[in-house]
Amino acid sequence: MRIAVLGGMGFQGRAALADLAASPPVESIICADADLTGFESKTGFFDTAKVTAVQLDASSSAELEATFRDGVDVVIDLLPRQLTETVCLAAIASGVGVVNTNYAYSIAHLDPQAKAAGVTIMPECGLDPGIDLILYSLTIRQFEEIHVINSYCGGFPEKAACDNPLNYKVAWTWEGVLSSTRRDARAIKDGRVVTIAGDKQHESQWIQSIQFPGLGRLEAIPNGNAVYFTDLLGVTETIRETGRYSLRWPGWSAFWRPLKQLGFLSDKPVKGLPCDISPYQFLDKLMGPELQYKKDEKDLVALVNVFEGLSAGKHIRRRSRREGTGLPGGRRTAWPPRARRCPIRSCHPGSPAGRGIAAPGSRPAAPTRRPWSTPAGRP
């Protein structure tokens, strides 16, 4: 099997390369990135005999297709979400499958094209979204009627690496983190759908606090469309409470709340400057380089899913919890590349898996549930 890893020089990309390099079914790997500077030093912790480095402009469909048609079977896309559709279209044109970690709804409209081309595209194959959604599907099967689904997930530095006011460092893209701080959230409270505007996301009324064994108190911020997934699973009609929350060390919301009020996340260019630059662009370029992991620092992830409902006529509560740490020096992020192993096999041209867009969160809980629906206001 020949795998192309887009964004192979990034934090997650290097972890994926190491995992693939140790996998016997993988015969060769393309590490594709716009900047290959330091390839030898950044990949020195694993055997690179099967790896070929290729400089690639991922915004160019022509370059993507040329790379994919060089004997590639499956593409692992670890690029920013802005490039997801471009990558998927190039993969469809080239007849190769794609695994990525972004939400499915941004490329749902490509399903007919992918099916017509006999291509499988599997989004949401990371931790969040990904493993959390698989746990959704597995756990709700234990209930006759599900009332509560709350998901809490986050990646952040271990305590020893918390040396800045945010107590946060970047394991993927800083712009992606910034974008999530102003994203609207949809939840269900007391049986009613609630929309939490992105500019209100860090207000104290929406912030929760949870205790995580071994880590202590963590801050939980509403983020993402929880109703989208209960609709896909066909359980929204019985849900009384659902939400998706990002976990951070305490103080995250207190940091962002005044910055939002002062317009630091605005896209509007600031008048009086010698060039058109917005506060959002400024924060991206200023803070991103300052929030990188140092050589011997580790990241960690925490995931908690809480379920409540009826089973055998009794009210029960289920909790699934996961914690993990990465290796030092950015050699392997805690965000699990192994979560992509099964999707890679499913996307292989020889796999019997169904074609089109196939995400972990797109399977109904059971055939007796109500059919899939299209929620109003889906992002």
Q: Where on the chain are the PLM-derived regions?
A:
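C-terminal catalytic/substrate-binding lobe primarily of soluble NAD(P)-dependent oxidoreductases
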Residues: 142-379
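Helix N-cap at the beta1-alpha1 junction of Rossmann-like dinucleotide-binding domains, i.e.
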Residues: 10, 34-38, 105
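N-terminal Rossmann-like NAD(P) cofactor-binding module of classical short-chain dehydrogenase/reductase
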Residues: 73-76, 98-99
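Rossmann-fold cofactor-recognition segment
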Residues: 46-60
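Rossmann-fold NAD(P)-binding glycine/threonine-rich loop
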Residues: 102-123
